[in-house]
Amino acid sequence: WKLGNKKIAKIVKQKKTGKPYAVIQGVKKGKTTLLARYKHGKKIRKLTCRITVLAAKKATPQKNVAVPSSTASPSQAPNRAPAITLTPVPTATPTPTWVTTWGTAEEKCDVTSNAMPQIALEDSTVRQVIKVTTTGSKIRFRLSNQYGGRDVTIKSMHIAKQVKASNPEINTDTDATVTFEGKENFIIPKGKVIQTDAIDFPVEALENVAISTFFGETPTTNITGHRGARATTYQVSGNQVSANTFSNYKKTTSWFFLADASLLSANGSKAVVCFGDSITDGYGTDATYLGKKPDSYTRWGDYFAKRLKANKGTENVSVINEGIGSNSILGSYPTDAGKDRFNRDLLEHDGVAYCIILFGVNDLDKLQNTDKYNLLLPEYQKMIETCHKNNIKVYGAPILPFGTSSFYSENSEKVRQLINLWMRSSESGVDGIIDFENAVADPANPQNLLAKYTNKDDGIHPYNGYQVMANAIDLNLFQ
Protein backbone atom coordinates (compact mmCIF):
# COMPACT_ATOMS: atom_id res chain seq x y z
CA TRP A 1 0.00 0.00 0.00
CA LYS A 2 1.15 3.53 -0.74
CA LEU A 3 0.02 7.00 0.31
CA GLY A 4 1.30 9.07 -2.60
CA ASN A 5 4.83 7.71 -3.08
CA LYS A 6 5.27 6.76 0.58
CA LYS A 7 4.85 3.11 1.49
CA ILE A 8 2.59 2.98 4.54
CA ALA A 9 1.59 -0.66 4.76
CA LYS A 10 2.96 -4.08 4.19
CA ILE A 11 1.63 -7.62 4.10
CA VAL A 12 3.04 -9.95 6.74
CA LYS A 13 2.19 -13.50 7.81
CA GLN A 14 0.95 -14.51 11.22
CA LYS A 15 3.49 -16.74 12.95
CA LYS A 16 0.97 -19.33 14.10
CA THR A 17 -1.41 -19.61 11.14
CA GLY A 18 0.70 -18.34 8.26
CA LYS A 19 -2.24 -16.20 7.07
CA PRO A 20 -1.41 -12.76 5.65
CA TYR A 21 -2.59 -9.50 7.16
CA ALA A 22 -1.95 -5.82 6.50
CA VAL A 23 -0.07 -3.42 8.75
CA ILE A 24 -1.00 0.24 8.30
CA GLN A 25 1.39 2.92 9.54
CA GLY A 26 1.43 6.70 9.59
CA VAL A 27 -2.17 7.38 8.57
CA LYS A 28 -3.87 10.31 10.26
CA LYS A 29 -7.51 10.56 11.25
CA GLY A 30 -9.78 11.46 8.33
CA LYS A 31 -10.13 10.42 4.70
CA THR A 32 -7.34 9.62 2.29
CA THR A 33 -6.63 7.49 -0.77
CA LEU A 34 -4.46 4.39 -0.95
CA LEU A 35 -3.02 2.64 -3.99
CA ALA A 36 -2.46 -1.11 -3.83
CA ARG A 37 -0.65 -3.40 -6.24
CA TYR A 38 -1.33 -7.10 -6.08
CA LYS A 39 -0.79 -10.22 -8.13
CA HIS A 40 -3.65 -11.85 -9.99
CA GLY A 41 -2.18 -14.93 -11.59
CA LYS A 42 0.90 -13.64 -13.38
CA LYS A 43 -0.43 -10.11 -13.84
CA ILE A 44 0.16 -7.16 -11.54
CA ARG A 45 -3.13 -5.38 -10.84
CA LYS A 46 -3.79 -1.98 -9.31
CA LEU A 47 -6.52 -1.09 -6.84
CA THR A 48 -7.29 2.38 -5.53
CA CYS A 49 -9.29 2.69 -2.30
CA ARG A 50 -10.62 5.54 -0.21
CA ILE A 51 -10.03 4.91 3.50
CA THR A 52 -11.55 6.57 6.53
CA VAL A 53 -9.48 6.49 9.74
CA LEU A 54 -11.98 6.35 12.59
CA ALA A 55 -9.49 7.00 15.41
CA ALA A 56 -6.06 8.55 15.78
CA LYS A 57 -4.73 5.94 18.21
CA LYS A 58 -1.23 4.85 17.29
CA ALA A 59 -0.02 1.29 17.09
CA THR A 60 2.57 0.06 19.60
CA PRO A 61 5.86 1.20 18.05
CA GLN A 62 7.75 -2.02 18.94
CA LYS A 63 5.35 -4.35 17.13
CA ASN A 64 3.50 -4.64 13.86
CA VAL A 65 -0.07 -5.63 14.63
CA ALA A 66 -3.03 -6.55 12.51
CA VAL A 67 -5.66 -4.07 11.42
CA PRO A 68 -8.95 -4.70 13.24
CA SER A 69 -12.25 -4.97 11.43
CA SER A 70 -14.20 -1.78 10.79
CA THR A 71 -16.70 -2.76 13.51
CA ALA A 72 -14.09 -2.86 16.32
CA SER A 73 -13.96 0.22 18.54
CA PRO A 74 -10.67 1.90 19.50
CA SER A 75 -11.44 1.40 23.22
CA GLN A 76 -11.64 -2.34 22.74
CA ALA A 77 -8.23 -2.46 21.09
CA PRO A 78 -6.14 0.34 22.63
CA ASN A 79 -2.85 -1.05 21.35
CA ARG A 80 -3.97 -1.75 17.79
CA ALA A 81 -3.72 0.29 14.63
CA PRO A 82 -6.72 2.53 13.94
CA ALA A 83 -9.84 0.88 12.49
CA ILE A 84 -10.46 1.78 8.86
CA THR A 85 -13.25 1.50 6.31
CA LEU A 86 -12.28 0.75 2.70
CA THR A 87 -14.56 2.03 -0.06
CA PRO A 88 -13.90 2.19 -3.81
CA VAL A 89 -12.89 5.54 -5.24
CA PRO A 90 -15.79 6.86 -7.36
CA THR A 91 -15.04 6.60 -11.06
CA ALA A 92 -15.68 9.42 -13.48
CA THR A 93 -19.04 9.38 -15.26
CA PRO A 94 -18.49 7.85 -18.73
CA THR A 95 -18.84 10.29 -21.61
CA PRO A 96 -21.37 9.08 -24.21
CA THR A 97 -20.12 8.84 -27.78
CA TRP A 98 -21.74 8.85 -31.22
CA VAL A 99 -21.63 5.52 -33.02
CA THR A 100 -23.38 4.44 -36.21
CA THR A 101 -25.95 1.85 -35.21
CA TRP A 102 -27.30 1.06 -38.68
CA GLY A 103 -26.13 1.78 -42.20
CA THR A 104 -26.53 0.67 -45.77
CA ALA A 105 -24.55 1.00 -49.00
CA GLU A 106 -26.07 3.69 -51.20
CA GLU A 107 -26.54 2.88 -54.88
CA LYS A 108 -28.12 4.40 -57.96
CA CYS A 109 -31.64 2.96 -58.30
CA ASP A 110 -34.26 3.31 -61.01
CA VAL A 111 -37.77 4.07 -59.77
CA THR A 112 -39.29 2.01 -62.61
CA SER A 113 -37.51 -1.23 -61.68
CA ASN A 114 -39.27 -4.06 -59.89
CA ALA A 115 -37.29 -3.33 -56.74
CA MET A 116 -38.82 0.15 -56.39
CA PRO A 117 -42.40 1.43 -55.95
CA GLN A 118 -44.39 1.76 -59.15
CA ILE A 119 -45.63 5.25 -58.20
CA ALA A 120 -43.58 8.38 -57.70
CA LEU A 121 -42.45 9.29 -54.21
CA GLU A 122 -43.67 12.89 -54.48
CA ASP A 123 -46.65 13.75 -52.22
CA SER A 124 -46.52 10.35 -50.56
CA THR A 125 -45.46 9.08 -47.14
CA VAL A 126 -42.84 6.35 -47.12
CA ARG A 127 -42.34 4.38 -43.89
CA GLN A 128 -38.95 2.62 -43.83
CA VAL A 129 -37.84 0.26 -41.07
CA ILE A 130 -34.34 -0.24 -39.70
CA LYS A 131 -33.03 -2.41 -36.86
CA VAL A 132 -30.58 -0.60 -34.58
CA THR A 133 -27.67 -2.63 -33.22
CA THR A 134 -26.70 -0.55 -30.18
CA THR A 135 -28.47 1.14 -27.29
CA GLY A 136 -28.61 4.94 -27.15
CA SER A 137 -30.39 8.04 -25.91
CA LYS A 138 -30.28 10.34 -28.96
CA ILE A 139 -30.43 9.63 -32.68
CA ARG A 140 -29.43 11.36 -35.90
CA PHE A 141 -29.47 10.34 -39.57
CA ARG A 142 -27.38 10.86 -42.68
CA LEU A 143 -29.59 11.33 -45.73
CA SER A 144 -28.08 10.95 -49.20
CA ASN A 145 -29.03 12.34 -52.60
CA GLN A 146 -25.66 11.40 -54.08
CA TYR A 147 -26.97 10.16 -57.43
CA GLY A 148 -30.08 12.35 -57.83
CA GLY A 149 -30.49 14.70 -60.76
CA ARG A 150 -32.41 17.21 -58.64
CA ASP A 151 -33.01 18.15 -55.01
CA VAL A 152 -35.10 16.03 -52.66
CA THR A 153 -37.70 17.98 -50.67
CA ILE A 154 -38.59 16.58 -47.25
CA LYS A 155 -41.89 18.12 -46.10
CA SER A 156 -41.98 16.17 -42.85
CA MET A 157 -40.01 13.33 -41.27
CA HIS A 158 -40.92 11.44 -38.09
CA ILE A 159 -39.55 8.39 -36.31
CA ALA A 160 -41.16 5.92 -33.93
CA LYS A 161 -40.69 2.36 -32.76
CA GLN A 162 -42.31 -0.32 -34.90
CA VAL A 163 -44.88 -2.40 -33.02
CA LYS A 164 -44.10 -5.67 -34.81
CA ALA A 165 -42.18 -6.77 -37.88
CA SER A 166 -43.87 -6.97 -41.30
CA ASN A 167 -46.47 -4.41 -40.24
CA PRO A 168 -46.66 -0.62 -40.73
CA GLU A 169 -48.01 -0.06 -37.20
CA ILE A 170 -45.96 2.20 -34.91
CA ASN A 171 -46.04 3.01 -31.21
CA THR A 172 -47.29 6.61 -31.38
CA ASP A 173 -46.10 7.25 -27.81
CA THR A 174 -42.56 7.14 -29.21
CA ASP A 175 -43.26 9.41 -32.20
CA ALA A 176 -40.64 12.15 -32.65
CA THR A 177 -39.98 14.82 -35.29
CA VAL A 178 -36.72 14.81 -37.24
CA THR A 179 -35.32 18.22 -38.17
CA PHE A 180 -32.41 19.64 -40.13
CA GLU A 181 -30.88 22.87 -38.84
CA GLY A 182 -34.02 23.24 -36.72
CA LYS A 183 -36.43 22.98 -39.66
CA GLU A 184 -39.09 20.31 -40.21
CA ASN A 185 -39.23 21.09 -43.94
CA PHE A 186 -35.82 20.82 -45.61
CA ILE A 187 -33.89 19.96 -48.77
CA ILE A 188 -31.32 17.28 -49.61
CA PRO A 189 -29.40 19.00 -52.43
CA LYS A 190 -28.60 16.95 -55.51
CA GLY A 191 -25.26 15.19 -55.23
CA LYS A 192 -25.07 15.88 -51.48
CA VAL A 193 -25.38 14.13 -48.11
CA ILE A 194 -26.81 15.91 -45.05
CA GLN A 195 -26.90 15.02 -41.37
CA THR A 196 -30.08 15.68 -39.40
CA ASP A 197 -30.20 17.26 -35.97
CA ALA A 198 -29.75 15.00 -32.95
CA ILE A 199 -33.05 14.36 -31.17
CA ASP A 200 -33.99 12.56 -27.96
CA PHE A 201 -34.99 8.99 -28.78
CA PRO A 202 -34.12 6.31 -26.20
CA VAL A 203 -33.83 2.95 -27.94
CA GLU A 204 -32.47 -0.49 -27.11
CA ALA A 205 -30.21 -2.62 -29.28
CA LEU A 206 -32.07 -4.79 -31.82
CA GLU A 207 -35.27 -2.72 -31.67
CA ASN A 208 -36.96 -1.76 -34.95
CA VAL A 209 -37.30 1.94 -35.74
CA ALA A 210 -39.71 3.23 -38.40
CA ILE A 211 -38.74 6.37 -40.32
CA SER A 212 -41.81 7.99 -41.92
CA THR A 213 -41.11 10.66 -44.56
CA PHE A 214 -43.56 12.86 -46.43
CA PHE A 215 -41.86 13.78 -49.71
CA GLY A 216 -42.17 16.86 -51.86
CA GLU A 217 -40.19 16.96 -55.08
CA THR A 218 -37.94 13.96 -55.68
CA PRO A 219 -35.90 12.63 -58.59
CA THR A 220 -37.91 10.32 -60.83
CA THR A 221 -34.84 8.37 -61.96
CA ASN A 222 -31.43 7.70 -60.42
CA ILE A 223 -32.85 7.63 -56.92
CA THR A 224 -30.25 7.20 -54.20
CA GLY A 225 -31.17 4.20 -52.12
CA HIS A 226 -30.58 0.53 -51.53
CA ARG A 227 -32.47 -2.13 -53.49
CA GLY A 228 -31.98 -5.13 -51.22
CA ALA A 229 -33.24 -3.95 -47.83
CA ARG A 230 -34.62 -7.42 -46.96
CA ALA A 231 -37.11 -5.38 -44.89
CA THR A 232 -40.53 -4.06 -45.87
CA THR A 233 -41.02 -0.40 -46.77
CA TYR A 234 -44.59 0.97 -46.84
CA GLN A 235 -45.95 3.78 -49.04
CA VAL A 236 -49.25 5.69 -48.86
CA SER A 237 -50.58 8.87 -50.44
CA GLY A 238 -50.47 12.19 -48.59
CA ASN A 239 -48.95 13.16 -45.27
CA GLN A 240 -49.37 10.29 -42.79
CA VAL A 241 -46.02 10.46 -40.96
CA SER A 242 -47.62 10.14 -37.50
CA ALA A 243 -50.37 7.69 -38.44
CA ASN A 244 -50.57 4.70 -36.12
CA THR A 245 -50.82 2.39 -39.13
CA PHE A 246 -51.53 2.50 -42.87
CA SER A 247 -54.27 1.13 -45.09
CA ASN A 248 -54.27 0.85 -48.88
CA TYR A 249 -50.50 0.91 -48.90
CA LYS A 250 -47.93 -0.28 -51.41
CA LYS A 251 -44.91 -2.33 -50.34
CA THR A 252 -41.34 -2.68 -51.48
CA THR A 253 -38.14 -4.09 -50.02
CA SER A 254 -35.88 -1.10 -50.67
CA TRP A 255 -34.64 1.91 -48.70
CA PHE A 256 -34.66 5.47 -50.05
CA PHE A 257 -32.17 8.24 -49.25
CA LEU A 258 -31.18 6.67 -45.89
CA ALA A 259 -27.41 6.32 -45.53
CA ASP A 260 -27.08 5.62 -41.82
CA ALA A 261 -28.36 6.24 -38.30
CA SER A 262 -26.14 7.08 -35.33
CA LEU A 263 -26.92 6.88 -31.63
CA LEU A 264 -25.44 8.70 -28.67
CA SER A 265 -24.31 5.55 -26.88
CA ALA A 266 -22.29 4.41 -23.89
CA ASN A 267 -18.63 5.35 -23.73
CA GLY A 268 -16.57 2.72 -25.54
CA SER A 269 -19.22 1.93 -28.16
CA LYS A 270 -17.70 1.00 -31.52
CA ALA A 271 -18.85 -0.06 -34.97
CA VAL A 272 -17.82 -2.80 -37.39
CA VAL A 273 -18.37 -2.34 -41.13
CA CYS A 274 -19.20 -5.48 -43.12
CA PHE A 275 -18.09 -4.69 -46.67
CA GLY A 276 -19.04 -6.89 -49.59
CA ASP A 277 -21.50 -8.04 -52.22
CA SER A 278 -24.80 -9.96 -52.25
CA ILE A 279 -23.57 -12.52 -49.71
CA THR A 280 -23.18 -9.73 -47.17
CA ASP A 281 -26.31 -8.00 -48.49
CA GLY A 282 -28.25 -11.12 -47.51
CA TYR A 283 -29.36 -12.41 -50.88
CA GLY A 284 -31.97 -15.13 -50.47
CA THR A 285 -33.17 -14.20 -46.99
CA ASP A 286 -36.38 -12.68 -48.41
CA ALA A 287 -36.81 -14.96 -51.44
CA THR A 288 -40.34 -16.35 -51.54
CA TYR A 289 -39.30 -19.08 -54.00
CA LEU A 290 -37.04 -20.40 -51.23
CA GLY A 291 -39.86 -20.23 -48.69
CA LYS A 292 -38.40 -17.13 -47.05
CA LYS A 293 -39.92 -13.71 -46.29
CA PRO A 294 -38.74 -10.14 -45.74
CA ASP A 295 -38.19 -8.85 -42.20
CA SER A 296 -36.58 -12.08 -41.00
CA TYR A 297 -33.26 -10.34 -40.20
CA THR A 298 -31.28 -13.44 -41.09
CA ARG A 299 -28.32 -11.98 -43.00
CA TRP A 300 -24.99 -13.12 -41.54
CA GLY A 301 -24.54 -9.57 -40.24
CA ASP A 302 -27.86 -9.81 -38.37
CA TYR A 303 -26.80 -13.03 -36.64
CA PHE A 304 -23.42 -11.44 -35.92
CA ALA A 305 -25.11 -8.44 -34.26
CA LYS A 306 -27.17 -10.74 -32.04
CA ARG A 307 -24.04 -12.61 -30.94
CA LEU A 308 -22.22 -9.37 -30.14
CA LYS A 309 -25.12 -8.16 -27.99
CA ALA A 310 -25.29 -11.41 -26.03
CA ASN A 311 -21.54 -11.51 -25.35
CA LYS A 312 -20.04 -9.65 -22.39
CA GLY A 313 -17.39 -7.27 -23.66
CA THR A 314 -18.88 -6.78 -27.13
CA GLU A 315 -22.40 -5.65 -26.25
CA ASN A 316 -21.59 -2.08 -27.33
CA VAL A 317 -20.31 -3.03 -30.80
CA SER A 318 -22.69 -2.17 -33.64
CA VAL A 319 -22.87 -3.76 -37.10
CA ILE A 320 -23.08 -1.75 -40.34
CA ASN A 321 -23.99 -3.72 -43.47
CA GLU A 322 -22.25 -2.29 -46.56
CA GLY A 323 -23.02 -5.10 -49.01
CA ILE A 324 -24.50 -4.54 -52.49
CA GLY A 325 -25.93 -7.34 -54.61
CA SER A 326 -24.09 -8.08 -57.90
CA ASN A 327 -21.35 -5.61 -56.98
CA SER A 328 -17.72 -6.35 -57.73
CA ILE A 329 -14.43 -4.80 -56.66
CA LEU A 330 -13.39 -3.75 -60.16
CA GLY A 331 -16.65 -3.36 -62.11
CA SER A 332 -19.17 -0.52 -61.80
CA TYR A 333 -22.32 -2.64 -61.83
CA PRO A 334 -25.00 -2.09 -60.64
CA THR A 335 -23.47 1.01 -59.06
CA ASP A 336 -20.01 2.23 -58.09
CA ALA A 337 -17.29 -0.42 -58.03
CA GLY A 338 -16.25 -1.68 -54.62
CA LYS A 339 -12.84 -0.05 -54.98
CA ASP A 340 -14.53 3.32 -55.59
CA ARG A 341 -17.08 3.20 -52.77
CA PHE A 342 -14.89 1.72 -50.05
CA ASN A 343 -13.77 5.02 -48.49
CA ARG A 344 -17.32 6.37 -48.42
CA ASP A 345 -18.84 3.24 -46.93
CA LEU A 346 -16.11 2.89 -44.31
CA LEU A 347 -15.07 6.38 -43.24
CA GLU A 348 -18.30 8.39 -43.29
CA HIS A 349 -19.82 6.50 -40.36
CA ASP A 350 -19.35 7.34 -36.66
CA GLY A 351 -17.13 5.27 -34.39
CA VAL A 352 -15.88 2.65 -36.86
CA ALA A 353 -13.17 0.53 -35.21
CA TYR A 354 -13.34 -2.66 -37.31
CA CYS A 355 -13.93 -3.76 -40.89
CA ILE A 356 -14.66 -7.22 -42.33
CA ILE A 357 -13.98 -7.58 -46.08
CA LEU A 358 -15.81 -10.44 -47.83
CA PHE A 359 -15.65 -9.44 -51.46
CA GLY A 360 -14.56 -10.56 -54.91
CA VAL A 361 -16.70 -13.45 -56.12
CA ASN A 362 -18.39 -11.32 -58.82
CA ASP A 363 -14.96 -10.46 -60.21
CA LEU A 364 -14.30 -14.15 -60.87
CA ASP A 365 -17.21 -14.94 -63.21
CA LYS A 366 -16.07 -17.56 -65.77
CA LEU A 367 -12.50 -16.29 -66.06
CA GLN A 368 -10.60 -17.29 -69.20
CA ASN A 369 -7.20 -16.64 -67.60
CA THR A 370 -5.69 -15.69 -64.24
CA ASP A 371 -4.93 -12.02 -65.03
CA LYS A 372 -7.60 -10.85 -62.56
CA TYR A 373 -5.35 -11.86 -59.66
CA ASN A 374 -2.87 -9.10 -60.48
CA LEU A 375 -5.70 -6.60 -60.86
CA LEU A 376 -7.50 -7.50 -57.64
CA LEU A 377 -4.51 -7.74 -55.32
CA PRO A 378 -3.62 -4.00 -55.38
CA GLU A 379 -7.25 -3.11 -54.61
CA TYR A 380 -7.34 -5.38 -51.56
CA GLN A 381 -4.06 -3.82 -50.44
CA LYS A 382 -5.47 -0.30 -50.78
CA MET A 383 -8.49 -1.21 -48.66
CA ILE A 384 -6.31 -2.72 -45.94
CA GLU A 385 -4.00 0.32 -45.97
CA THR A 386 -6.99 2.68 -45.72
CA CYS A 387 -8.20 0.85 -42.63
CA HIS A 388 -4.82 1.01 -40.92
CA LYS A 389 -4.31 4.69 -41.77
CA ASN A 390 -7.57 5.39 -39.96
CA ASN A 391 -6.82 3.17 -36.93
CA ILE A 392 -9.38 0.59 -38.02
CA LYS A 393 -8.66 -3.10 -37.56
CA VAL A 394 -9.37 -5.02 -40.74
CA TYR A 395 -10.27 -8.70 -40.91
CA GLY A 396 -10.06 -10.59 -44.18
CA ALA A 397 -12.68 -13.16 -45.15
CA PRO A 398 -11.39 -15.47 -47.91
CA ILE A 399 -13.71 -15.74 -50.93
CA LEU A 400 -16.32 -18.49 -50.53
CA PRO A 401 -16.31 -21.51 -52.88
CA PHE A 402 -18.66 -21.49 -55.89
CA GLY A 403 -17.79 -24.69 -57.74
CA THR A 404 -21.38 -25.66 -58.59
CA SER A 405 -22.39 -22.20 -59.84
CA SER A 406 -22.47 -20.77 -63.35
CA PHE A 407 -19.49 -18.57 -62.37
CA TYR A 408 -17.14 -21.53 -62.13
CA SER A 409 -14.17 -22.15 -64.40
CA GLU A 410 -10.78 -23.65 -63.67
CA ASN A 411 -9.16 -20.22 -63.93
CA SER A 412 -11.79 -18.71 -61.63
CA GLU A 413 -10.97 -21.33 -59.01
CA LYS A 414 -7.23 -20.76 -59.43
CA VAL A 415 -7.62 -17.02 -58.84
CA ARG A 416 -9.89 -17.64 -55.83
CA GLN A 417 -7.29 -19.92 -54.26
CA LEU A 418 -4.44 -17.50 -55.00
CA ILE A 419 -6.32 -14.59 -53.41
CA ASN A 420 -7.28 -16.65 -50.37
CA LEU A 421 -3.74 -17.95 -49.93
CA TRP A 422 -2.41 -14.38 -50.02
CA MET A 423 -5.10 -13.12 -47.64
CA ARG A 424 -4.27 -15.81 -45.10
CA SER A 425 -0.55 -15.00 -45.29
CA SER A 426 1.29 -12.37 -43.27
CA GLU A 427 1.92 -10.46 -46.51
CA SER A 428 -1.71 -9.31 -46.66
CA GLY A 429 -1.38 -7.24 -43.50
CA VAL A 430 -4.86 -8.04 -42.22
CA ASP A 431 -5.35 -8.08 -38.47
CA GLY A 432 -7.05 -11.46 -38.54
CA ILE A 433 -9.02 -13.93 -40.63
CA ILE A 434 -12.78 -14.53 -40.50
CA ASP A 435 -12.93 -18.06 -41.88
CA PHE A 436 -16.33 -18.14 -43.54
CA GLU A 437 -14.80 -20.21 -46.34
CA ASN A 438 -14.23 -23.37 -44.33
CA ALA A 439 -17.43 -22.84 -42.34
CA VAL A 440 -19.64 -23.34 -45.41
CA ALA A 441 -17.44 -25.36 -47.80
CA ASP A 442 -18.15 -29.00 -48.58
CA PRO A 443 -15.33 -30.91 -46.80
CA ALA A 444 -15.36 -33.57 -49.51
CA ASN A 445 -15.29 -31.00 -52.34
CA PRO A 446 -13.91 -27.76 -50.88
CA GLN A 447 -14.35 -25.89 -54.17
CA ASN A 448 -18.13 -26.16 -53.55
CA LEU A 449 -20.53 -24.82 -50.95
CA LEU A 450 -22.05 -27.56 -48.80
CA ALA A 451 -25.26 -28.49 -50.61
CA LYS A 452 -27.56 -27.84 -47.63
CA TYR A 453 -26.48 -24.20 -47.46
CA THR A 454 -27.44 -23.23 -51.02
CA ASN A 455 -29.79 -24.09 -53.87
CA LYS A 456 -28.79 -26.45 -56.68
CA ASP A 457 -29.47 -23.64 -59.19
CA ASP A 458 -27.35 -21.15 -57.25
CA GLY A 459 -24.11 -22.43 -55.72
CA ILE A 460 -22.83 -18.98 -54.72
CA HIS A 461 -25.08 -17.73 -51.91
CA PRO A 462 -25.11 -19.78 -48.67
CA TYR A 463 -28.49 -18.36 -47.60
CA ASN A 464 -29.15 -21.38 -45.41
CA GLY A 465 -25.71 -20.99 -43.87
CA TYR A 466 -25.65 -17.32 -42.85
CA GLN A 467 -26.00 -18.24 -39.19
CA VAL A 468 -23.17 -20.76 -39.55
CA MET A 469 -21.03 -17.96 -40.96
CA ALA A 470 -21.84 -15.65 -38.05
CA ASN A 471 -21.04 -18.42 -35.58
CA ALA A 472 -17.60 -18.80 -37.17
CA ILE A 473 -16.61 -15.27 -36.11
CA ASP A 474 -14.28 -15.08 -33.09
CA LEU A 475 -15.88 -12.39 -30.91
CA ASN A 476 -12.57 -11.85 -29.10
CA LEU A 477 -11.47 -9.92 -32.19
CA PHE A 478 -13.99 -7.22 -31.25
CA GLN A 479 -13.30 -6.88 -27.52
Enumerate the language-model features and the residues they cover.
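Extracytoplasmic soluble-region selector
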Residues: 1-66, 70-72, 86
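N-terminal secretory targeting modules
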Residues: 55-275, 280-288, 292
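Conserved SGNH/GDSL esterase-like catalytic core that processes O-acyl groups on lipids
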Residues: 151, 157-163, 237-241, 245-254, ...
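Active-site flanking residues adjacent to catalytic metal/cofactor-binding acidic residues
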Residues: 275-277, 397, 434
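Catalytic His-Asp segment of secreted/periplasmic serine-dependent ester chemistry enzymes
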Residues: 365, 400-479
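Surface-exposed amphipathic alpha-helices with a cationic face
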Residues: 380-388
